[in-house]
């Protein structure tokens, strides 16, 4: 919810899924970002570095959990900072913006039992069923192809609390340049997306959200 992927990136996913259907393999897509457009000045980040074949298809994603910004480029460490390996800022990484056909839900369900058995045994409190692990399984078994849709969009996210002012300024600039309206929807329009019963009564400010303001909306049951 705190990721901004860029408007063009969503269009790329939509356009791809609109004209591609599964054949003997699942036909998926993933937006690939330039690493330099996904980094923060405030600490290290985890990114999935993509291996892409000559046809623009994803071969694999290698997760590096400690990547730091170095000018327009970056470097990662796997030994708690004792040594670093350089990475070009143009390296393509996954930010988990995927496009799937509906059959992917069945594949998620298929692997969940094995994940749960292993996770509960080895790390019951923190085990996570990572979406890319399902993609990797399908690639390894030759059941899927993933087209990498390259973008120069800048990704914004709040990895560290110090990132928040920069992200807010970036969103404000998008508004000023008319990429988005200053108010995406009214409070009542937002409330209409939820299944509230009754008659709208009022809304009042309710603290500050992570990026956006939050409100408490009150509805009364009809008598």
Per-segment meaning from a language model:
Residues 37-42, 137, 204-207:
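Short linear motifs in intrinsically disordered
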Residues 1-4:
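The conserved acidic donor/metal-binding loop of glycosyltransferases
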Residues 31, 149-151, 206:
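Conserved beta-strand termini and adjacent loop/short-helix elements that scaffold enzyme active sites
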Residues 54, 61-186:
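Conserved alpha/beta core of the MobA/IspD/sugar-nucleotide pyrophosphorylase nucleotidyltransferase superfamily
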Residues 6-97:
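Conserved core of the sugar-phosphate nucleotidyltransferase
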Residues 183-223:
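Conserved NTP-binding catalytic cores of kinases and kinase-like/nucleotidyltransferase enzymes
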Residues 52-57, 152, 218-222:
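Short acidic-glycine loop/turn motifs at beta-strand connectors
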Residues 50-52, 148, 214:
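A structural signal for short hydrophobic beta-strand segments in well-ordered beta-sheet cores
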């Amino acid at each position: 919810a705190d990721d901004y992927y860029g408007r063009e990136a969503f269009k790329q996913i939509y356009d791809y899924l609109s004209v591609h259907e599964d054949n003997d393999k699942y036909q998926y897509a993933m937006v690939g970002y330039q690493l330099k457009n996904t980094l923060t000045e405030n600490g290290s980040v985890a990114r999935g570095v993509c291996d892409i074949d000559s046809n623009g298809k994803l071969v694999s994603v290698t997760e590096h959990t400690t990547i730091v910004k170095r000018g327009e480029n970056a470097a990662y460490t796997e030994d708690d900072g004792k040594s670093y390996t350089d990475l070009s800022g143009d390296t393509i990484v996954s930010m988990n913006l995927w496009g799937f056909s509906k059959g992917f839900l069945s594949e998620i369900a298929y692997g969940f039992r094995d994940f749960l058995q292993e996770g509960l045994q080895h790390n019951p409190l923190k085990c996570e069923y990572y979406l890319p692990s399902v993609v990797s399984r399908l690639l390894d078994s030759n059941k899927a192809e993933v087209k990498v849709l390259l973008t120069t969009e800048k990704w914004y996210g709040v990895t560290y609390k110090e990132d928040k002012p920069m992200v807010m300024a970036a969103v404000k600039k998008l508004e000023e340049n008319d990429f988005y309206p200053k108010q995406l929807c009214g409070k009542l329009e937002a409330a209409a997306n939820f299944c509230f019963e009754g008659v709208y009564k009022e809304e009042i400010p309710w603290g500050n959200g992570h990026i956006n303001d939050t409100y408490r909306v009150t509805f009364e049951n009809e008598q």
